[in-house]
Amino acid sequence: MKTKKLAVIGASYLQEPLVRKAKEMGLYTICFAWADGAKCAEICDKFYDISIVEKEQILKVCQDEKIDGICTIASDVAAPTVAYVANAMGLVGNDYEAAVRANNKYLMRNAFMKAGVPCPKYMMVTPETIHTPEVIDGLRDFQFPMITKPSDRSGSLGVTKINMPSEHYPAMELAMSKSFMHEAMVEEFIEGREISVEFISYKGTHYPLQITDKVTTEAPHFVELEHHQPSTLSDEMFAKIYDITKTALNALGLTNGASHAEYKITNEGRIAIMEIGGRMGGDFIGSDLVRLSTGYDFVKGVIAVALGVFEEPKMTIGKHSGVYFLCKETEAIKPILDDWKSHPEIVQCEITDTELRNVQCSADRSGYFIYQSDKKFTI
């Protein structure tokens, strides 16, 4: 029987769980990425030193290789290339235009507004428009505080909370400098708890997997410090969030594969979806926490979608799982990482840097530990 070939877009540490799972499933893995930082080049069957945004070049190689499926995890930038190749080769994947929409916060918000999906008030700013009357007048329509962020980046990179008019332009310039398209989003700041939602979809049917409670640093950078599953939200709120997410996925046209939605919920009960990525959540949410809390192998599910052999998810356990990240702000957890083997709940631990820094983005964190237990692991 012919061994199936799976193309993986990206080869950094983020894709390592995907490549290892594919190998475990007996698949032939082909990774595409720049060689610099390509950790998966050492473990995949074949590696191509091609930028993940070079979709035409990657398509040609995939056609020559006669791949059976293509996917990525935890990478927004790779998603349009995955869709482009899948569409061109008749493989399972999202429509290319849908993947582009999900990769641009402005296009995404426009789709949400059209479909009646609750989201923050927003405005786009570019180098050409930043000093125009339209933007100057538009800024007056927002109340302080507000948020600026790149339109096409994930995580906390380039995100700033603005508290006064003098901060407008430095924050917008920063966001544009971090954007691939040099575009900044200005949006209302919503005070409330942060959650994220994991779904997997197959041919237009959406399956909810889990909701994650999040802990972040305060303004201005909002770097994530903790994730915990399942969320402590009520069953009624779970159902409401799942319904909104399905509507949002349909609004974007995302029909296949993993998705990761981020929400804010105010004390008054207002729900606002901040964004959806056409990929699973990073920070171990998709690769580890979902499996540890539900028993469902999310990574294996993503591969099954790509190969067209997906089966409806089955949740086999009901545990608590989570991750704590090490940095200057969380230095109190350092003794736990140093002695993690004495904590039976901890299933994985790594210190990546001996220096603890105040974090401005996720890359500034110096380690982590992942737990699974019958209740939330609290410190």
Locations of regions flagged by a protein language model:
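Conserved protein kinase catalytic/activation segment
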Residues: 269-271
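ATP-dependent carboxylate/phosphate-activation module, predominantly the ATP-grasp catalytic core
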Residues: 166, 188-254, 258, 265, ...
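Active-site nucleotide/adenylate-binding loops and adjacent lid/helix of ATP-dependent enzymes
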Residues: 104-185, 191, 203, 227, ...
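Peripheral (often C-terminal) accessory segments that flank ATP-dependent C-N-forming ligase machineries
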Residues: 114, 136, 303-379
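ATP-binding N-terminal substructure of ATP-dependent carboxylate-amine bond-forming enzymes
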Residues: 1-98, 129, 311, 319, ...
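Flexible, glycine/charged-enriched surface loops at secondary-structure junctions
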Residues: 256-262, 312-317
